[in-house]
Structures are given as structure tokens and as C-alpha cells.
Design a protein with these regions (language model features):
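Ligand-binding loop in jelly-roll beta-barrel domains
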Residues: 40, 96-121
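A short, N-terminal "cap"/entry segment at the start of jelly-roll beta-barrel domains
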Residues: 1-43, 123-127
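Glycine- and acidic-residue-biased ligand/ion/polar-headgroup-sensing regions
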Residues: 63-75, 80
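Conserved short histidine dyad/triad with adjacent acidic residue
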Residues: 45-62, 96
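Short acidic-glycine-tyrosine-enriched beta hairpin
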Residues: 81-97
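Short beta-strand His + acidic residue motifs that chelate non-heme Fe in jelly-roll/DSBH
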Residues: 57-59, 77-78, 99-106
Length: 127
């Protein structure tokens, strides 16, 4: 068993890895921290992503479902058919294979915890 407290999760950008604004990311900066070490779970990945105002992922899909938990900020999650506003406390389930994006609007930052099946493959669908 492993307990992770939010106070033990690195919250300053200096303690997180910069994902940049290229590749899957667009807009301003996105920051990342893996919460589980690679040997902690054979089944899941568990990390936090912090989006500066105006940053988002490009459209993409995963071979496994993705769960997003919003611990702070205001953001959006969109598919080919709809865009939802997300706020602190929201939980979003993105089914495997669903084309989507997630990120922060121009005016505010947003962070989300991401939980995925280990080995899930991400395919970027937006240039």
C-alpha cells in the first residue's frame, strides 16, 4: 500500500519537469510530475500536469481510458463534439479511443491529476 498526500506532491514549477509547448502541447508552458514511481504499480500511471494560462494539449487519443481529477484552477476538456468547463473538484472520464484535448484558458491556469492504464499509447491527432 502507498499513501500519497497532496502536501507531498511537488507544487512549484522548479520541482516539476517542463513539457514545453511543442509536440503534444500547444500555447504556453505545461509542467509535469509523476506521482507513482515506475515500480509502484503494474497497472496504472499516476501524475499531475500543471497548465499555465493559455496552454493545452493538442487533440489526441489514448489506447486506454484516462481519468482526470482537477485539484485546482479552471480549464476545459473537449472532444470532436463538445467542450466542457472543468473546475477544482471535477473528475472527468475519457474513454479509450476518444479524440480529445485538455488545458487552461487564456486567463487562468489549471492543474489535473491523470490516471491511466500502464502501457496506454497516446496518438496525437492534431498537427
Amino acid at each position: 500500500m502507498k499513501k500519497v498526500t497532496m502536501s507531498s506532491v511537488r507544487k512549484t514549477k522548479a520541482e516539476m519537469s517542463a513539457l514545453g509547448s511543442g509536440g503534444l502541447m500547444t500555447g504556453t508552458q505545461v509542467w509535469a510530475q509523476e506521482i507513482l514511481e515506475s515500480g509502484d504499480s503494474n497497472d496504472f500511471t499516476f501524475g499531475i500536469r500543471s497548465f499555465d494560462a493559455g496552454a493545452r494539449t493538442k487533440f489526441h487519443k489514448h489506447s486506454g481510458a484516462q481519468i482526470l481529477i482537477i485539484p485546482e484552477g479552471v480549464g476545459s476538456v473537449g472532444t470532436d463534439n463538445e467542450t466542457l468547463s472543468i473546475v477544482e473538484g471535477d473528475v472527468v472520464l475519457i474513454p479509450a479511443g476518444e479524440n480529445h484535448f485538455h488545458g487552461a484558458p487564456d486567463a487562468t491556469s489549471m492543474a489535473h491529476i491523470t490516471i491511466q492504464k500502464k502501457g496506454s499509447v497516446t496518438e496525437q491527432t492534431e498537427a
